[in-house]
């Protein structure tokens, strides 16, 4: 792996250590861009996807990233990447840190998004966890309703679709 803590807009796509003159052939990434950045953070997504030839990407992004200021970024992204799923996350997922509704966008990298491609829109606002914002609590995340199983179900939905699952 090549795990780096860098400014992703300034990242040149090279290995961060070892053979630093060679391109790192990433085939997967997870990104949580700053939502206040250009295009509601989608400028980071566009750059990261543009550095890959193939693979998959998961983006944790605010709900407004699908429209408005991000529209031109999204058009460019979909010219060479397919949106597989848009997953609505719980509104309190960043409780105590941020109060923004977030989604996870899952992309297949290197394949143009065709107009007839079916995107999976998944409402995961009830993930089974209860969150608290108590500062001194040892556990601010309580599994109240099969949370681990629910997260596995989301993975299976994205990978296989509802037709292959017993839901």
Question: Model segments located where?
Answer:
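A conserved structural/catalytic subdomain of Rossmann-like adenosyl-cofactor enzymes
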Residues: 11-167
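Conserved SAM-binding strand-loop segment of SAM-dependent methyltransferases
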Residues: 2-8
